[in-house]
């Protein structure tokens, strides 16, 4: 498993390196083939801005990755707690011989949405 992770890491590093090379080549081609024209934004400047945006995206991705993991774990814990609660309620209803009323349309819709959401986890 760790070898696969290392292989993926190398693939991402190569892709990043390839993108840097492509950016360098584009900047060079633009500088040599298209001199700055008046009134238009310099394509090289646009590429540099794109590079800055890419860097900010990577930083955000690194910062929010742990948050996404924690969010997924929290959702799983909530679903587990919900399922336990529903099981407990059903057991209590059986033990007390409580007669259940049919669900309203709104309750049916909410239950369907909840089931769909829980299956996505």
Swiss-Prot record:
GO terms for molecular function: microtubule binding. One of its GO terms (biological process) is mitotic cell cycle. GO terms for cellular component: centrosome; cytoplasm; meiotic spindle; outer kinetochore; spindle microtubule. It is found in: Cytoplasm, Cytoskeleton, Spindle; Chromosome, Centromere, Kinetochore; Cytoplasm, Cytoskeleton, Microtubule organizing center, Centrosome. Keywords: Cell cycle, Cell division, Centromere, Chromosome, Cytoplasm, Cytoskeleton, Kinetochore, Microtubule, Mitosis. Its main location: cytoplasm. Belongs to the SKA2 family. PANTHER family: SPINDLE AND KINETOCHORE-ASSOCIATED PROTEIN 2. Component of the SKA complex, composed of SKA1, SKA2 and SKA3. The SKA complex is a homodimer organized around a central W-shaped coiled-coil structure, formed by the interacting domains of SKA1, SKA2, and SKA3, each end of the 'W' is extended further by the C-terminal microtubule-binding domains of SKA1 and SKA3; the complex forms extended structures on microtubules. May interact with NR3C1; the relevance of such interaction remains unclear in vivo. Interacts with the MIS12 complex subunit DSN1. Component of the SKA complex, a microtubule plus end-binding complex of the outer kinetochore that stabilizes spindle microtubule-kinetochore attachments, promotes alignment of chromosomes at the mitotic spindle equator (chromosome congression) and assists suppression of the spindle assembly checkpoint. Kinetochores, consisting of a centromere-associated inner segment and a microtubule-contacting outer segment, play a crucial role in chromosome segregation by mediating the physical connection between centromeric DNA and spindle microtubules. This is SKA complex subunit 2. It comes from Bos taurus.
